[in-house]
């Protein structure tokens, strides 16, 4: 379609052309562009690092120190899962529709699920139950807002894909929260997931916009939030032992674990590795930590080996820059 036609024209088919394109962006890009790329590509790096140990018990696998093959989905090293695929769908929709459009977004999610669009291997993997049910409802009757299903609606599927919204709307703190909520509601009928998305969007938007991470956290702590999220916000993450950190698919656990990993490290790589080595829902904890750490440290701080080993890294980088146009 036109979007990837534009990406191809910009990036070309060779690594050298992509290198030239990066140089072009680096010359004209601000520190904000660097943090935007860090957040978006960082999501994918955390996803790819964590994918091979997703569902693994903490301490029950060799320490993750870089990309590796295998895991439940038997992916090649550097390949990513639903976290990144859905983020690409969201980014593509925001660009093509010049803003948020629930129907277009759900159509793109359906293309990913049914036809393997926007995947790293040509096959969709890792879809969550909330998303699966919602897309079923969308295909059957065009439902654009997720409906509650039993008691399990508080998954992390809308949090993991959030970065594109922040990349688009970081300079409007009210709108970035509104759009974070809107994209969450397409697949998750959960006030808790909604609020976690709003919080993370506000945090990342402030950091991308130039605030320090500490100031952004302090400013957001003064706002009113519901109990499960407020407990995360008020938690002393630097003092928390790893044994106290849950890395489950519950959205509050995921956000808490990602913040813990970021606040107990001093670099992008350190944050995402600390996150994925928690195990359990490792790819999504890694993806959320990657978004936060990428926004803090920027794309330029990411080690070359993490860029070189990531499947479709060129497309991910360029997509992040199209979100800023």
What are these regions (language model features)?
Residues 1-325:
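Structured, active/binding-site neighborhoods that engage oxygen-rich ligands
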